[in-house]
């Protein structure tokens, strides 16, 4: 790239934020393509050998990673194709935009998928968000990226995904691909153990998954597991790992119980229907000395967000391979272990925290005022105080609250919701506002953020081989209903930007 690193020693150090986000972008669509029970470590290294400062390299790296796995001896059900598309000022989706074209567009979206035997493309991963030009373009007549336009973008992406897959197949056909290894497949439990656990504890497992409160449900699960272990363990005394097998079988049956109730009865763990939201609350001005603060709670998920204002010298200097040199709007997300009732080291942000912070940052970016309208540096921090699913989307809601509490004239309030999916016997059941357990036992985590009129950010991960675009379109419509409900609750807490805090005024002037 023709750049000397900006660090003190002028040498590459650990992976920076952009590299971590690119790694996550690559990992997410590739992971479901490995066979069930495959536990061998696979290390895929993407090295940027050259960067022209015009074309993004992340999607190129994703396609390259898929191609590398396809021509290796690793069991991998590929290829996976990926494309970045942009919604232009003229209201068209264009593929593989340059950095400049992306900045001038209203919305960018990375879509990855696999080609099915019938020629269709199953979507495996989506990462999308509005740009700094979104609001101005919408004001000047560019069609807003709503659910319908986004669904059209998913359909449009299939053509270019197929082209990426075709290129990879050309590579596969041109080289001697070694035979795929037959790795040892880890079996979580023997059939006999599974049946013994089912006989001893199925009814108890089902009952434990009908307890709405997370702490009470967790205690009930531990009690049921202990009862099953006491009943079943003596039957397999000769098995070296009997305890582990029994615990794995209990988890598998728990997953079955949760999914069966959702598909057959339309009832979830906490008794909600598939479209129901948990209890909501929103509050601002929680910390008087903060420039802005917002507390958002959805069920047992609670996030406290802070906004801090600074002058230009507080901008973040960016030292990576992109053309961006500095950032005046930052969002940092912290997920301490106490938020899930656990202990652990707190040594700085992990990859997940960096990813969630970037998603929440992207969700608010289109509505943050430009430097000309608001000449301040903005740092937002989301502190997860309690977690039971969808803390990143709670961070989006908390961000809106704290920005308005700080007096930042955002273009419009933004809210976010996490959607889930259960697939069984050819039927897709979409869930609104998923719990942590529904994320773990379900087949999709689909996060959607936006205003009342348009979408500002979106992220999709799936454990399936892919999700039909029609199912995603329905999930988008369902998410909009939930988003509007969230915005109603937030509007009751604060309906317009407040006056700037005296603490902020004394600091910034």
Q: Model-flagged regions — what are they?
A:
Residues 1-42, 48-55, 122, 127-142, ...:
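Glycine-rich, flexible beta-strand/loop modules in the N-terminal catalytic cores of phosphate-handling
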Residues 75-203, 406-496:
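Mobile "lid/hinge" segments at catalytic clefts and subdomain interfaces of large enzymes
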